[in-house]
């Protein structure tokens, strides 16, 4: 039963009264609960969550009073929200990342104007043990029915914000009411719905980790380790002194992995090693430099910083250094580092991560749960590449929190509310799944909300299907009116899942806005075809775009992904014009989609910032209108592909080019003039004629790679030679080395032989006679 809060709190001698409320209203009504929460949190070295629900001004006033009563200094408080209503640090929700890597005694999260799930995920981890996370919200009974700025971002045309369901916020409120350590105060009624007190035993002093007996790092290093996990991670880093070693550290947020990396970096620099640190942003790696500098000071060695705060380089006198470079610069291993430390590796594309495998020694540290996300790139694809490398790999897992007790209820709540710990089903439950044993299911948001295990399995698989998954993706899954979920289940457990987005069906005015360069939310495929490829009518047909698709790792290569796509097409074929997809192209993925009936209509000319690959757009038409749409875009793609491959796409993987062209599914004849055919026929007499006019050779290559008259005419290596030399115009020397020819002469002769075979396949009889004159 809610309890009534007593009347106004009077000042008590010795209390902090230094906060100023900028609303102009008095901060009254008893908030003794805050004092009790803080006291309990400090005794147990845990955090507590205080929800103040009601009128915006009143909740802000009560927040000021609560923090005063809880004896939280303004200097240790941050407000995250639209207004800086306290005399303390303030950030908008859009700038919540400013709290990453920092520690605060209290964070006040003002959710009155909007609730951004990513901002919650980024800020809750900043609260130290003994601290408070204060959430300001509208009345909880009506909050799920309200629509805010974040909800508006989920409404993509032709849907409006009124179509957003509010399921995420409803579930969010339910978790607040269900979890330990969370106090809820209705400031309008003056009642405490729940006090959040758990009566935990006092925290016991944690003994310092025992240093390893055979340590190579100096003894001062292990004296700075706070947990056994951290000690074990630091000891694993000792292997980096030897070339050919790799260390992979996976940890939840707040486990001290960056600090452990910093302790290792300090030791290595003191031992005359050049340590290169990189990460998606400097702030994610800043703790490495803080900890390395502290350790060097403990060593008593002379070293310099390139700047007094946030240093990006530490130089040890007469020894090595620790230096930072952003990933695009660090990937070339500038100045030959001895060791590379990649922080938050899961946030980097696989293509970028692979480049660090050339370092003498390397560590990859990443967050397992949390907004940073460990998605397909790191957990699946890159792990495979790492295993194939020549590096000896040491795996380290860190689970013990550094700054608060491992029984902390706020972390438990955050993991549940944001599904940061979502996982697919364990292998044993689904290892017998086959296309014949699975059930196709249409999963509504209501279905997912009603079954927590089902929601965790679905979201856990979707996390693995993408390079980076954030809490906002959970809100989209539950609330976005254009999204639907389809899955295959085996004995009730999810083995494959797809997230679909409705696109197209746009009004004339929306299509005009899009065509003229205006921003229209969602509708990625119509946007690309309309804005970039100048086809305004592309927004008329209605389609379903496959945003993500994933199959459980234990049952891959059994045809379950194809089974799911087949069921999706069968369900939607009579209701939409097309099913489509856009993704970072790899040879394997392009072949998968092509085998399932999808055809190439576009290949982006810049790499995707998330995947690091060139994105391909593919369509599977379901209606005559969509068939016409796909046909004209296939034609236009064939028209332009040779030109873009020799310029913006000249570094595209030749196997991607081969797969993308083969997936165009359009037989376009070779159209060469008589003179161009004579040029082609002359290549066997000297491949240098290719430089005279590359156009006919490109047309012939495009024809064969997209729709070969004889698919066995050329080997994969010969097709790669066509891509690299004819389509991408790489120098002979580069092609010779990449494709392992003995000499440039051999490379030229091979190309001449290839052109001869293609000429006989596609040339008229008189062309073959011309060819014979040069043999």
Swiss-Prot record:
Residues 438-623 form the N-acetyltransferase domain. Residues 1-33, 191-215 are annotated as: Disordered. Its EC number is 2.3.1.193. Acetyl-CoA binds at residues 549-551, 556-562, 588. Keywords: Acyltransferase, ATP-binding, Cytoplasm, Nucleotide-binding, RNA-binding, Transferase, tRNA processing, tRNA-binding. HAMAP family: tRNA_acetyltr_TmcA. Belongs to the RNA cytidine acetyltransferase family. TmcA subfamily. Residues 199-212 have a biased composition (Pro residues). GO terms for cellular component: cytoplasm. It comes from the Archaea. It is found in: Cytoplasm. NCBIfam families: RNAactase_tcmA_Halo (NF041296). PANTHER family: N-ACETYLTRANSFERASE 10, RNA CYTIDINE ACETYLTRANSFERASE. ATP binds at residues 230, 254-263, 403. GO terms for molecular function: 18S rRNA cytidine N-acetyltransferase activity; ATP binding; tRNA binding; tRNA N4-acetyltransferase activity. InterPro entries: Acyl_CoA_acyltransferase, GNAT_dom, NAT10/TcmA_helicase, P-loop_NTPase, TmcA/NAT10/Kre33, TmcA_N, tRNA_acetyltr_TmcA, tRNA_Cytidine_AcTrnsfr. It is an enzyme of class 2 (transferase). Pfam families: GNAT_acetyltr_2, NAT10_TcmA_helicase, TmcA_N. One of its GO terms (biological process) is tRNA wobble cytosine modification. This is tRNA(Met) cytidine acetyltransferase TmcA. Catalyzes the formation of N(4)-acetylcytidine (ac(4)C) at the wobble position of tRNA(Met), by using acetyl-CoA as an acetyl donor and ATP (or GTP). Its main location: cytoplasm. The keyword tRNA-binding applies. It catalyses: cytidine(34) in elongator tRNA(Met) + acetyl-CoA + ATP + H2O = N(4)-acetylcytidine(34) in elongator tRNA(Met) + ADP + phosphate + CoA + H(+).
